[in-house]
């Protein structure tokens, strides 16, 4: 049997699939051939299968380095449920429990061993690794090794030395969902990958509907509550920037009768574990979390992710939003933002980064990098281009024809023309072009009048003729620009100022109190032929339901993902009824075995089951996601439910 045949056989036996997803086969065969690999694949594309198949086919243990221990138990449970012996070593175990795992791994009884990168630095683990055959090392979330990435973790810097120190170096696989070209180079260099086979699959997630809503902070909680109320049977994640907002929003949802749990780094380990358990077992449908929840979830049926605040980077947003729809089913990702979010993010960025492993100069380099990452995120909020295209271009790829929509619409080179992806709010909106030359020039002159010494709030007040007490020291009435824009809406002035900063006419000096200064293109605003426009969504969108209009009253429409746009299969009433019965059975089995429902079967597998309606072993194995081990464990109970349903329908 060739390596290719063996890999396909293992894929079918353990995972219930008869073919690999794009990119998987090449990575699997490279690792089986003893070659290092770097796999950059979107969340939900099956990165873990790329090292789990080689682990199943290799004689020794595969060491999986993963950043969050909160995820390990679920990963290990899922693998054991597939018939792949797996275990973890982390701080939740007693010394005796760890000793048992070490002994099992040394005896060849464990195929995959999960550890955090900090574990590699302990003498006990290094001794274990020196005397235990390790056939493969898989580094998950490999972007954490790079200071240029959005989630740098200094503990990852020791992985390369650990690998070098092994008596016999095994092939190494590094995997991530988010990595620009610069981050990829860091991963290869810092982990010491040797001539790796690099696989970068498309970054687009066509089953996700991307939505951007500009909304004042005071309206955000109502927007979220309305969305959750309209989707009572769906699992969702709501990300917030601070612990305080996280707890307040979770309390608000609960008070309104929408069960939700909070999750953030300030909670005790037991409280975080309980919150995560309630969410992944479907006991509570919604988790409101800070980014501490970012890599700690492996739940396949999350139907929506809402960002209550602006994320720190496109990488962070892509990864967090990517928690939705991991099973390939249509899901929605909504970003709520406003100008205050940008100011808050910049302040957090400047005040929140310290690392004892780095010199002050290196820390400043990291800060500058993170400022550039934030600029990319702000650009995502303001673009009028296709949001799928913006995302893929950011990662260095062009959106191909048919990408961004599984319905198969062709996307033109410019989404403002005929091509619309059908899976983002920009492509479902009509934008109007507004001439704001006078506003832009007035702003630029006012920045000059105040000597580049104040923030955007004071600039706006002066231009609109405010005599507020906090302006007295500036004596604004003597300035030529005082009251120059008193006829312009305050929100419009703020909007133009912010857009000018994005376009380089202005810059925002970083610090505790951000100051508006001239940007690299400032001189252009004084030119006789200077012309400046902004694009804003019209109140009536091209397709009803765009969240771009930003009003709470629009929430009911904006909550609906167009099924035809996402190419989703629409089941008939019988299939939907059977699907719900299969979900109930899955929940019952999950409670009996004490595991999350998605570990039994994913929603996608249950959908396929409801469509095929298998009543024999052969038919059951034909369902996507059903392998022999799952058939042995659960097949009879599911087929009995299907047979009973068929009998009832026939009568």
Model-derived segments and spans:
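Accessory DNA-binding and partner-docking regions appended to nucleic-acid-acting proteins
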Residues: 1-7, 90, 343-344, 349, ...
